[in-house]
Regions:
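Extracytosolic and intramembrane catalytic regions of membrane-associated proteins
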Residues: 36-226
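Internal/C-terminal transmembrane anchor helices
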Residues: 1-40
């Protein structure tokens, strides 16, 4: 399935959390997803994500902090997903990253048309394409569908959570000819074997939520001004 997410800073209300770690129990556990993340040009990292249902990042269990030196990181997701999280270095990069290929880039009638190829691995369970507000997205066409935006200057994320999205060609209609950076990520359910100790450290008063623990591998491409 495909979905288009429009993110605007003014639309997100973050809870300001101070003081001690909230009280959670086996009966009422905290939602904490663990993620192994690799992105182009950045070291691999572990992410502990508590931001579900738009509630923002809250303190993570002390057992996780003892297992890894997690720190609040506003750019933990490298824009693949909005908001921040707790992150810690995870050692050398170990995976091949997905790829973005520019197939055609042209301007006509005041609009920029960008055709791209997106390739993820055979292990991908889903993909995410991030288009920044600087691009002025009007529409995305792929697989016979056209998803339209109102052209508002906001960040956009195209999310496809099925394995058949591993290889896509998409056409972006843009109102801007400025330079910008596209980001593309594949999502794999579950963690690499090295994440087993973090799952143990999460303890029994915290549980994964929604799609659960994941491996996220991200690439990016800078589009020059046209």
């Amino acid at each position: 399935r495909l979905s288009l997410s429009i993110s605007a800073g003014a639309a997100i209300v973050l809870a300001v959390l101070t003081g001690l770690e909230p009280a959670y129990s086996k009966a009422s556990p905290q939602r904490v997803d663990l993620v192994y993340f690799e992105g182009a040009g950045a070291p691999a990292r572990w992410i502990a994500d508590t931001a579900w249902k738009g509630l923002g990042t809250e303190p993570i269990p002390q057992r996780l902090l003892r297992a890894e030196p997690f720190k609040r990181d506003a750019s933990a997701w490298q824009e693949i997903f909005p908001g921040g999280a707790y992150s810690a270095l995870a050692g050398p990069n170990a995976y091949f990253l997905p790829q973005i290929r520019v197939l055609q880039d042209r301007v006509a009638g005041g609009l920029r048309t960008l055709e791209i190829g997106l390739h993820a691995s055979a292990q991908a369970d889903g993909v995410v394409l991030y288009v920044p507000k600087e691009a002025g997205l009007r529409a995305i066409a792929l697989r016979g569908q056209t998803l339209e935006s109102d052209g508002a200057k906001v960040d956009t994320r195209l999310v496809c959570l099925t394995p058949d999205c591993r290889d896509l060609e998409a056409t972006l209609t843009l109102s801007s000819t400025k330079s910008f950076r596209l980001r593309f990520a594949e999502i794999r359910y579950g963690l690499p074997a090295s994440g087993a100790r973090l799952k143990i450290a999460r303890g029994d008063t915290a549980v994964p939520s929604q799609s659960g623990d994941e491996t996220v591998l991200a690439d990016s491409a800078v589009l020059p001004a046209h």
